[in-house]
């Protein structure tokens, strides 16, 4: 029984990222090639003219406190809960606004943090 291309594609599609990375390294070693595309080939392969570049969806976000608003104490409490900082450190972050509260947060984490901070009266920006 021979294996079809569809079966190979299905098998590779079910691999985890780590398994796929190891698989690619093994193929590179076995065939003496590199999976990285040369820069010149990438420039030639780029679509020309009116084709708009596809934007990748951002997966990591920075949570930035723009201002504490009127309820500074409530905002400090939320900052402490979100960041795990002590009272003094959280107060310094709030007093030093605009300041980055968290970097490389997931989309869900960033949205939840923004919701909590806005409810406490803060002005927040997600980048």
From Swiss-Prot:
Read off the NCBIfam families from this record: L12
Return the InterPro entries for the record.
Ribosomal_bL12, Ribosomal_bL12_C, Ribosomal_bL12_C/ClpS-like, Ribosomal_bL12_oligo, Ribosomal_bL12_oligo_N_sf
Organism the protein comes from: Nitratidesulfovibrio vulgaris (strain ATCC 29579 / DSM 644 / CCUG 34227 / NCIMB 8303 / VKM B-1760 / Hildenborough)
Similarity comment text for this entry: Belongs to the bacterial ribosomal protein bL12 family.
State the function annotated in the UniProt record: Forms part of the ribosomal stalk which helps the ribosome interact with GTP-bound translation factors. Is thus essential for accurate translation.
- Can you cite a GO biological process for this protein? translation
Give the UniProt entry's GO cellular component terms: cytosolic large ribosomal subunit
**Keywords for this entry?**
Ribonucleoprotein, Ribosomal protein
Subunit field text? Homodimer. Part of the ribosomal stalk of the 50S ribosomal subunit. Forms a multimeric L10(L12)X complex, where L10 forms an elongated spine to which 2 to 4 L12 dimers bind in a sequential fashion. Binds GTP-bound translation factors.
Domain of life, source organism: Bacteria
Q: Which PANTHER family match?
A: 39S RIBOSOMAL PROTEIN L12, LARGE RIBOSOMAL SUBUNIT PROTEIN BL12M
CDD domains, sorted: Ribosomal_L7_L12
Q: Biased composition, Basic and acidic residues: where in the chain?
A: 104-114
Q: Which HAMAP family match?
A: Ribosomal_bL12
Extract the Pfam families matched here.
Ribosomal_L12, Ribosomal_L12_N
State any single GO MF term. Answer: structural constituent of ribosome
Q: What is this protein called?
A: Large ribosomal subunit protein bL12
- Region (Disordered) residue ranges read 94-114
């Amino acid at each position: 029984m021979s294996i079809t291309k569809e079966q190979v594609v299905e098998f590779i599609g079910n691999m985890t990222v780590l398994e796929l990375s190891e698989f690619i390294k093994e193929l590179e070693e076995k065939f003496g090639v590199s999976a990285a595309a040369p820069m010149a080939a990438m420039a030639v392969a780029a679509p020309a003219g009116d084709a708009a570049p596809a934007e990748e969806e951002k997966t990591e976000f920075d949570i930035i406190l723009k201002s504490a608003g009127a309820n500074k104490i409530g905002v400090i409490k939320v900052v402490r809960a979100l960041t795990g900082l002590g009272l003094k450190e959280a107060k310094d972050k709030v007093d030093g606004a605009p300041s980055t509260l968290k970097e490389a947060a997931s989309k869900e984490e960033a949205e939840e943090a923004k919701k909590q901070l806005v409810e406490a009266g803060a002005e927040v920006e997600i980048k």
